[in-house]
Amino acid sequence: MDLFEMLEDNHSTNNQNDSSDYKKEYRIVLQNYGIEAPDALLEELASYHLDPPPWAPWAK
């Protein structure tokens, strides 16, 4: 097995976990303000961290 294949598989699994973590965090923050957000909105917000736009200050 190639080393890069191992890293790519681990990275894709890591992204899925990160998305779930971001969704949970957004849900908690919005619930603190009394907002019940649909899953589609939470997924869209989480996607900005996984695939940021080019102007994103947190992008590397």
Swiss-Prot record:
Source species, domain of life: Viruses
Protein name listed in UniProt: Uncharacterized 7.0 kDa protein in modB-mrh intergenic region
